[in-house]
Amino acid sequence: MIKDAVNTETVEVNPVDQVRSTIYQLLSSLFAKEIDHKILHDLTSEQAQQFWAQLGSEAEFKADVDVLVAELAKLNTDKALLELAADYCGLFLVGTKYSASPYASLYLDDKPAKKGDEPLLFGEQHQQMTQFLKQSQLQVQSEFPEPADHLAVILAYVAHLCTHSDEAEQHSFIKANLANWLGNFVAKVTEVDTGNFYQALARLTYSWVKSDAEWLESELN
């Protein structure tokens, strides 16, 4: 999703921050592209099942984790994978009133769109995220030709921050660039999604981000 633009030194990471980074990275990957056979294998492996069980042991995440695990178990045919890929495309790749575009700028822009106006991509939020990436000596991978304010990029950047920045910086970034629009995105996904997987993924992402922001705040106080 994002990669080092230059070589960076290895940093020592505590186990809690490593787990947090892993969760953000997983969520990022699921918004970045459709689930294929390889991703499905990774998401249903024995190690993954242990991960889902641990995440689902938290009451606030359990319902959505259960839905995701159940939906993944249904992806046992090519047809089922194609149908989920069609859901992904309809939700996140096609910019219509029946989609839930995953770009921060579409939820943070305080200028009301006139009827018929196309949403502005590669705008202010994209430029801001590009600057954040540049400051951290990171860049969006070339095979992901999306604006930098795509949810997958932002989640991947938070995954990076978890292991490369202090708690104050993490908390500030999450509050200013993720938590402030994710609720509206989740509402849109819930409104237009005809399946269960991406609704549950969006809700889980929002629940996790809120919980993580609260944890960071408690650590700072």
Curated annotation (Swiss-Prot):
Primary location class: cytoplasm
Q: Where in the cell is it found?
A: Cytoplasm
Asked if Protein transport is a keyword of the record, the answer is no
Q: Which Pfam families does this one have?
A: Nitrate_red_del (PF02613)
Keywords of this entry: Chaperone, Cytoplasm
The processes (GO biological process) annotated in the record are: protein complex oligomerization; protein folding
List the GO cellular component terms. Answer: cytoplasm
Gene3D superfamilies according to UniProt: 1.20.120.1820, HscB, C-terminal domain
Q: Which InterPro entries match?
A: Chaperone_TorD, DMSO/NO3_reduct_chaperone, HscB_C_sf, TorD-like_sf, TorD/DmsD_chaperones
Family indicated by similarity: Belongs to the TorD/DmsD family. TorD subfamily.
**PANTHER family with a match to the protein in the record:** CHAPERONE PROTEIN TORD (PTHR34227:SF11), CHAPERONE PROTEIN YCDY (PTHR34227)
Q: What does this protein do?
A: Involved in the biogenesis of TorA. Acts on TorA before the insertion of the molybdenum cofactor and, as a result, probably favors a conformation of the apoenzyme that is competent for acquiring the cofactor.
Its name, as the record gives it, is Chaperone protein TorD
- Species of origin: Shewanella pealeana (strain ATCC 700345 / ANG-SQ1)
* Gene this chain is encoded by: torD
